[in-house]
């Protein structure tokens, strides 16, 4: 569950105010012009920015002032932020243990998540040997390893071609079903999401100006 009550950010160029209610397990697309406040909305929910006033509730707990690591949220960006000198397995391990010293149970968990995103045979590879779509699968798997119930996606697939975007969106939908995730996805291609989301939010001039259900 995500609930924002009169959340205000006093940005110098564009003051923003957000009111939002998303039920647990819902999938929501966020659209709008560049600079309208879409990424800022996700950053406020994730804890990368803090509001001047208002409240942010996540899964029935007030997280308005919580640090990012304290929130029930994982966030995936367009930049996959993989370490080029580490294998896929090691990059995934960073999601649960920065020391990379894994227990047998943690190693098994990594292998299971890697298989769930189609990377079971790529664990020993370095990122430079992967395609763009495979790199984003690694980044997605790292998010999933954190076992957070809310998944935020900030245009993570915009650099991929249409075929790969459709494949990744289908994978996201499958994982949301399996793990009962609440999803917020910033996109410039809402037509690719038809039939797989519950709401579309339109962000305009720092506010949510429209809400469309059942897309």
Swiss-Prot record:
Keyword entries, A-Z: ATP-binding, Cell inner membrane, Cell membrane, Membrane, Nucleotide-binding, Translocase, Transport
Catalytic reaction annotation: thiamine(out) + ATP + H2O = thiamine(in) + ADP + phosphate + H(+)
Enzyme class, spelled out: translocase
InterPro entries with a match to the protein in the record: AAA+_ATPase, ABC_SmlMolc_Importer, ABC_transporter-like_ATP-bd, ABC_transporter-like_CS, P-loop_NTPase, Thiamine_ABC_ThiQ
Positions annotated to bind ATP: 32-39
SUPFAM superfamilies xrefs: P-loop containing nucleoside triphosphate hydrolases
GO CC annotations on file: plasma membrane
SMART domains according to UniProt: AAA
Recorded topology in the membrane: Peripheral membrane protein
PANTHER family: SPERMIDINE/PUTRESCINE IMPORT ATP-BINDING PROTEIN POTA, THIAMINE IMPORT ATP-BINDING PROTEIN THIQ
Subunit comment: The complex is composed of two ATP-binding proteins (ThiQ), two transmembrane proteins (ThiP) and a solute-binding protein (ThiB).
Record protein name field: Thiamine import ATP-binding protein ThiQ
Classification of source organism: Bacteria, Pseudomonadati, Pseudomonadota, Gammaproteobacteria, Pasteurellales
């Amino acid at each position: 569950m995500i609930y924002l009550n009169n959340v205000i950010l006093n940005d110098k160029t564009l003051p923003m105010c957000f009111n939002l209610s998303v039920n647990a397990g819902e999938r929501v697309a966020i659209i709008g012009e560049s600079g309208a406040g879409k990424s800022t909305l996700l950053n406020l929910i994730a804890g990368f920015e803090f509001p001047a006033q208002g409240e942010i509730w996540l899964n029935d707990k007030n997280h308005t002032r919580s640090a990012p690591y304290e929130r029930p949220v994982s966030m995936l960006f367009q930049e996959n932020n993989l370490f080029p000198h580490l294998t896929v397995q090691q990059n995934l391990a960073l999601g649960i243990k920065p020391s990379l010293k894994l227990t047998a149970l943690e190693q098994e968990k990594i292998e299971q998540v890697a298989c769930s995103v189609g990377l079971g045979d790529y664990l020993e590879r370095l990122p430079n040997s992967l395609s763009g779509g495979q790199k984003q699968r690694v980044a997605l798997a790292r998010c999933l390893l954190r076992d957070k119930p809310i998944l935020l996606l900030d245009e993570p697939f915009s650099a991929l071609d249409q075929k790969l975007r459709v494949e990744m969106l289908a994978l996201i939908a499958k994982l949301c079903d399996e793990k009962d995730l609440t999803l917020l996805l910033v996109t410039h291609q809402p037509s690719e999401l038809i039939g797989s989301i519950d709401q579309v939010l339109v962000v305009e001039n720092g506010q949510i100006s429209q809400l469309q259900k059942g897309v």
